[in-house]
Amino acid sequence: MFKNLCDKIMTQKILITSALPYANGPLHFGHIAGAYLPADCYARFQRLMKKDVLYICGSDEYGIAITLSADLAGRTPQEHVDLFHHINQSFFEQLQISFDHYSRTTWKGHVEPTHQFFNDLLQNGYIEERTTDQLYSEKDQKFLADRYVVGTCPRCGFENARGDECPCCGASYEATELKNPRSKLTDASLILRPTKHWFLLLEKFKKPLMEWLETKNWKPNVINFIRGYIDHLHARAITRDMKWGISVPLPDSEGKVLYVWFDAPIGYISATKEWALLRGEEKLWEKYWLDPETKLVNFIGKDNIPFHASIFPAMIMGQNQPYKLVDELPANEFYNLEGKQFSKSDGWYIDLEDFFKHYTSDQIRYAIASNAPETSDSEFTWKDFQLRCNSDLLGKYGNLVNRVLVFIHNQCQGKVPESGVLEEQDRKFLKNIQDLVDQAAASYSTFKVRKASQIMMELSQLGNVYFDSKKPWQDAKNDYTKGRMHTTLNCCMECLKALALISFPIIPTAASKVWQFLGFQTPLEQEDWNRVKIEKLPLNQKILTPQILFQRVENEAVEREILKLQQLSLTKEKKSTPQSTQISISENILLKPLVDIEDFRKLDLRVGKIIQANPVPKSKKLFQLLVDIGIEKRIVVAGVAEFYKVEDLIGKNVVVVANLKPANLMGVTSQGMLLAAKGEGNLKLISIEDVAPGSLVS
């Protein structure tokens, strides 16, 4: 019975997916830190644990944004996605992301499972047809989706509001609510015209989703977010009026395609089917997707939580195939760059192609892993990158490997020496090694890559301290102490073996080299974690001459990279200056005539203290704030959710327009407005310290 249980555990199937990257541009470091490096570390570890691992990903290639970008670039949508599919696939290879298969949603086999989902959901009563008014361009002779539309915000009157949300006040709305809507491409006026679409009735899944969620022990940030999201589930359109996408499988649906968020997660299934076909075993995919004993792990960024924790599970519940529901959902927070969000449009990013001309995949993998955004946002800085590379990889890890192996080559003819009688310090050292190996395994298995990277360096430092304290160079001077030297070096070799093992998921190139230096013929990736952990190094095994594992990152290189980043950002800013200046003149002079002092005096500006802050349901931009303005406490809805965390707002003194007429924003009545300064990609509330709530501002 015990053997059967062990066999079941050892052969457990683990299906790992990373969120499909959108083939609308090249990847950047922020993407890698969220869904790809953590997944790859987990996959590599579980393979070492001899689990039946299948790691699947692919390009997400449909959607309105693709057609918009392709139009602007003068390419067809297919040419556009072909370009970025291959660029991103190449980046993944350079980063050594070990997908078992990397697919794409434009491959013909993706259509069948997508249609199967739609037909099942329709027949089971979870999809219904509705006719709604949508914005239509008579000039272009087509309906325009949100991304193609601009107009006047129905809330604050800003004239360049986007089709789904206002960048000025943060309000979310339907594109049909815009005043004076016009085409983003041609500036042509738009009219409302009825059109038919199909809606997924997500509200029908609230109860089963909540019951299913109760069985999960996910990160608190995931559970807390998705509970609120499920509470507000409602019917969502799953079709669009366009040509680029998966067709709607109904006879009266010409010119309609399935919305990208509907078909994209089905790409996990179609990619697995393609993998099986390429192996010549057409039904092999069923072993993973249709077996309830399979462990399904979806690695995503936090912006994908709604789709993977509610919408796609609802789609699976509503169709007829016994597909696996996700078991684990490691959702990471955002990874920023030098204090700001990565932004290609703002020139605030690191070009991966350029990066690989100067640095290695191990360097960036370790730098990201050691500061992974697992529970809160984190950031990449060039100074920190230099510190991680020089102090950790070179100074601790590389130094230990080099000094031990060079010493053995010089004193032991390049062979693993025999250990003598262990002293208490030796036994403690070897036990600490085993403990750290176990801790690393626990960290990898629970998606704690950051902790695993710390353990890796703790083991490196443990070996360095032991080597220094035992002073084998002194024992080498006398024949009667060489036995002691051999014992020290044998223990150090055990440390290097363990170090190669636990570091392989994070820095596979360096770890594999260390493994080869130790004289092993079998590639490390094919080894068994538990066997390597307990087996001793063979006596007299011939070791290889060590090579340099890591290069130093010089100050000049860091200064060059920071300057390059600043220049790229400045170039982007200059290119946008003419348009920005034109908009500024239009908004600040033409739209806002001069006022006299009496008009200004009509405003009641007061200091308010924020005492509560809560996200507004169904809005990414808005917070509902409870503000003390001295004479009373008021609800104020503010579009600051992108720029402030709840804890940053509590207790903050702000300036409130206290006599503004109440306005309804996303179902919440706002009794005022906060003053803020808004720059390119940033917003700061006007704050006044050390002044009592209710104080007048003039």
Swiss-Prot record:
Pfam families: Anticodon_3, tRNA-synt_1g, tRNA_bind. Its cofactor is Zn(2+). Keywords: Aminoacyl-tRNA synthetase, ATP-binding, Cytoplasm, Ligase, Metal-binding, Nucleotide-binding, Protein biosynthesis, RNA-binding, tRNA-binding, Zinc. GO terms for cellular component: cytosol. GO terms for molecular function: ATP binding; metal ion binding; methionine-tRNA ligase activity; tRNA binding. Residues 599-698 form the tRNA-binding domain. Binds 1 zinc ion per subunit. It is found in: Cytoplasm. It comes from the Bacteria. The keyword Aminoacyl-tRNA synthetase applies. It catalyses: tRNA(Met) + L-methionine + ATP = L-methionyl-tRNA(Met) + AMP + diphosphate. A motif ('KMSKS' region) lies at residues 341-345. It is an enzyme of class 6 (ligase). PROSITE patterns: TRBD. ATP binds at K344. Zn(2+) binds at C153, C156, C166, C169. One of its GO terms (biological process) is methionyl-tRNA aminoacylation. InterPro entries: Anticodon_Met, Met-tRNA-synth_bsu_C, Met-tRNA_ligase_1, Met-tRNA_synth, Methionyl/Leucyl_tRNA_Synth, MetRS_core, MetRS_Zn, NA-bd_OB-fold. Homodimer. Is required not only for elongation of protein synthesis but also for the initiation of all mRNA translation through initiator tRNA(fMet) aminoacylation. Belongs to the class-I aminoacyl-tRNA synthetase family. MetG type 1 subfamily. This is Methionine--tRNA ligase. The gene is metG.
